[in-house]
Amino acid sequence: MALPWVEKYRPKSFADVVDQEEAKYVLASWICARFRAPKDFCTRWAKKKDKEILDARAVLLAGPPGVGKTTLIHALAREIGYELIELNASDVRTAERLKEVVGRGLREGSLFGYGGKIVLFDEVDGLHVKEDAGGLEAIIEIIENSKVPIVMTANNPYDPRFRPLRDISLVVNLKRLSEEEVVEVLRRICTSEGAKCEEEALRSIAKSSLGDLRAAINDLQMYLSGGRKTLTVDDIKRVGERNPQLSMFEILDRVYRARWFDEARAISFNPSFDWEQYFIWATETIPVVYKEIETMSVAYDRLSKADMFIGRIKRTQEWELLPYALELALGGVSQIKSKPRLPPFIKYGFPQRLLILAKSREARKRRDVLVEYLAQNLHVSRSYVKSEIIYVLGVLAKSDSKIVERLSKALGINAIDIKTLL
């Protein structure tokens, strides 16, 4: 099963990261000044002596998608022998969860003799300050108390909401790659894969990527999928150049109508593809497409196995398992022996799960506010309120109808809100 080329050809060393020399010098100077790092690494890369760099508590790498922000930190950790603790800040949003994951990672010993640890908060601009239950404040608190390097990435960290984060961090801007730099990387990959790629074809891919190297590599892998060993300009024209906007309805239709396995698998290379959203939509659309119980059963079996891989990935951070999950979820669901002939038009409905979450959003927000209020006034954690106190209050309310009124008066909370909570 093919590993995504963005992972296969991810730079293994600091020097291998394409361009971004200024960012490398700043990052290395900060690491060498404030933490331990190999002497030869510091001699080569620690070129900056600015007070702003040396005094920074954390580093925030800023730049458009695909310029190497995350890759730079992976290469840095490998180069200096540090264990990387990586979190996507837009996935782990709450203060409690952030502290739990980071704390566990810092407490646990390493099995591989790393010289230290470095924490990476990826995509911090994915946090929604109001909705995400103290996530931003938690990151700031972790930075202020941390004794290990904290690095963050963001596409656009200059939103006013992230001012507190910028105030305690050194913002390092990574520039968009030139067309020539992207072509050079694509050329090396073609050589490594034993593929004969026309120069104009590579330039076409690079031009449409707009400096996003990750997108360009994904496109190249898509064009050369299925064991193809040649790439011409005509191939690009026939398949079509990058389309950055593909709705979930179009993604589903392409998956179900794919004529062969690699065609379905290649959907994951599209920049619009979101595998978490895909799993939600696929779960509810399989019965719409496959009417026969046997076919439906096979599709669900493969999707559930893919979901098991995703669960393990989230628990262990073994992202090398992702290709296996995507092959099952895309090619596995698409290519079924008893697959029927599909009609010209399939009406895909919007997932009920997402509709329910959207409708209940306000109720859930009110519930969270009430839980927070109870936690502060009773001097317990929010998880304790949810797991213990709400249950006990619910039992008491069933045996004594007046307890809700007494709670309302004692805590100064609307009785209707308390009933909603229970």
UniProtKB/Swiss-Prot annotation:
<comment type="subunit">
    <text>Heteromultimer composed of small subunits (RfcS) and large subunits (RfcL).</text>
</comment>
<keyword id="KW-0547">Nucleotide-binding</keyword>
<dbReference type="InterPro" id="IPR003959">
    <property type="entry name" value="ATPase_AAA_core"/>
</dbReference>
<dbReference type="InterPro" id="IPR023935">
    <property type="entry name" value="Rep_factor-C_lsu"/>
</dbReference>
<comment type="similarity">
    <text>Belongs to the activator 1 small subunits family. RfcL subfamily.</text>
</comment>
<comment type="function">
    <text>Part of the RFC clamp loader complex which loads the PCNA sliding clamp onto DNA.</text>
</comment>
<dbReference type="InterPro" id="IPR027417">
    <property type="entry name" value="P-loop_NTPase"/>
</dbReference>
<dbReference type="GO" id="GO:0005524">
    <property type="term" value="F:ATP binding"/>
</dbReference>
<dbReference type="InterPro" id="IPR003593">
    <property type="entry name" value="AAA+_ATPase"/>
</dbReference>
<dbReference type="InterPro" id="IPR047854">
    <property type="entry name" value="RFC_lid"/>
</dbReference>
<dbReference type="Pfam" id="PF00004">
    <property type="entry name" value="AAA"/>
</dbReference>
<dbReference type="GO" id="GO:0006260">
    <property type="term" value="P:DNA replication"/>
</dbReference>
<protein>
    <recommendedName>
        <fullName>Replication factor C large subunit</fullName>
    </recommendedName>
</protein>
<dbReference type="GO" id="GO:0003689">
    <property type="term" value="F:DNA clamp loader activity"/>
</dbReference>
<dbReference type="GO" id="GO:0016887">
    <property type="term" value="F:ATP hydrolysis activity"/>
</dbReference>
<dbReference type="Pfam" id="PF21960">
    <property type="entry name" value="RCF1-5-like_lid"/>
</dbReference>
<keyword id="KW-0067">ATP-binding</keyword>
<feature type="binding site">
    <location>
        <begin position="63"/>
        <end position="70"/>
    </location>
    <ligand>
        <name>ATP</name>
    </ligand>
</feature>
<keyword id="KW-0235">DNA replication</keyword>
